[in-house]
Amino acid sequence: MKKVLALILALAMLLTLTACGGKEEETITFVLDWPPNTNHTGIYVALQKGWFEEAGLKVDVVQPPEGGSALLVASGKAQFAVTAQDSIAPALTGENAMPLTTVAAILQHNTSGIVSPAGEGMDTPKGLEGHRYATWDSPVEKATIRQVMAADGGDFDKVELIPSTVTDEVSALKSGDVDAIWIFYGWAGIACEVAGLPIDYFDFADFDPVLDFYTPIIVSNNDWLASNPETAKAFLAALSRGYEYAAENPKEAADILMEAAPELKSNAELVYRSQEYLAGEYIADAARWGEIDPDRWGGYFTWLNDNGLMETPLDPGMGFTNEYLP
């Protein structure tokens, strides 16, 4: 009899422990847009701190496929991806529109612009006249350069376009093969500083506020969001904690990033200085991390429409939501 009672008690304890274990962790696939860098620090912080695990989530971070990060999300093979407002705009309209919604902005402002060797007269857009610009031949890219040059009294048609996909801005500028390159200052601009390369630089948004579009951003799949709203909120709450930590603790956050991506350790000074720079950009003047201003978002889409850059016009209010942010 005692043995039977002991067996019953053991089974009861096992069932209690199983129940206390809660439901199984949900797996989230998060697709980067580039190899790990300081734009991605928040997700690695949230992973290292166990904040996703606390939320009942198992998060797998993966590299983007050749077709781009958003494609995996649109096809339902991933739940979230990093991309940019200008990149997803064409994917949101037309017969083959992708079911994507932007759920957070990683940075509050567009930190991209044009870099050139110091003292060559390209510290403003008009100065690009008569110089060689490295282009990847995108209509939106060229319209952006044309816009800032016009705002500065310059003529885009006087720029020599050199087809070139630059991956090492420092080497490209040192080689003299091109004079000007579109960069994101938080990484490539800092890389020039670390290399001791004297440069001139201007931000697009300083010459036309409509070009202060959101980049990078985080997108999700419309159908998945509709079916999993609480999971989306839990994921973004944990991710927000990661970026808030990175904003307040740049050195510690940089260390976490380099532990997750050891290949970055050979450029530790770049990582630390980039992280310090972006610490002020993750939240900046917004009320919270991830917030998207409808007017600024819609203003950029209107600009794309007005410049004939979309085959099918965009609704200025489409493609984003703040409802899943904490």
Stretch-by-stretch model annotation:
Residues 226-307:
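Secondary-structure end/capping motifs
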Residues 26-165, 172-175, 179-186, 202, ...:
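Short, glycine-/small- and polar/acidic-enriched structural segments
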